[in-house]
Amino acid sequence: IGVGSASHSTGNTVLALNLAQESALLGMKTLLIDANFQAPAIATLLDLRKVSEENKWRDMSENLSISEITQEKAAGFNALAVEAASYFDLIYIDLGTLANLSSDLTDRRWASQVKIWVANLAQNIVITSTTDLLQQRRLKDLQQDLSKISIRPNISLAVLSASDYRKRDGPILTSTYPMSHIWQIPFDARACSLAMKERTTLAQVSAKCPLRKAFLNIATQIT
């Protein structure tokens, strides 16, 4: 499952991290891969040292493991993915921004290799956006980009802070590109701040908050 954003600062890393945690808690043996080359953040959010130096992945708990792809490791990603697929039930990949995706899929540079793999072999891609005007513009651009290419994964949309999403913008966006799911994710600054302070996931620090329940709902549907 690839997790990427229509633009920067839409919470895709937080979503990928918490979905991986929820899947692990549901009993799925789960690997979370940080392939956001421009701004890797998962190790920082979890206060982990030298994750990028691991040959394969680092086990965090019985069902959750973490990996970080670097330029040096990108060439061997296909082999890593094959081995991981034989060991894990579920693999989440933080892709960072998906802007200019069609160009990336024809690019032979190292930074595009994971996106190419996801486009050809993943089951799902979850795109994150917000209700901010500029983010909505970037999302529309991405959906137009998607309509011009053929990729294997089902595409879903997670809209952060979006209580009015369906009422206001739903018909415009869904007519641009068909989405398998559209999820509305509530904003909870307190829960997010607590998770960042404790360097962990929402399931560990605020299990009953609406935001955590939203993550659990998504994980249940896509696993």
Q: What do these predicted ranges mean?
A:
Residues 65-117:
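Phosphate-binding/switch loop-helix module in NTP-utilizing enzymes
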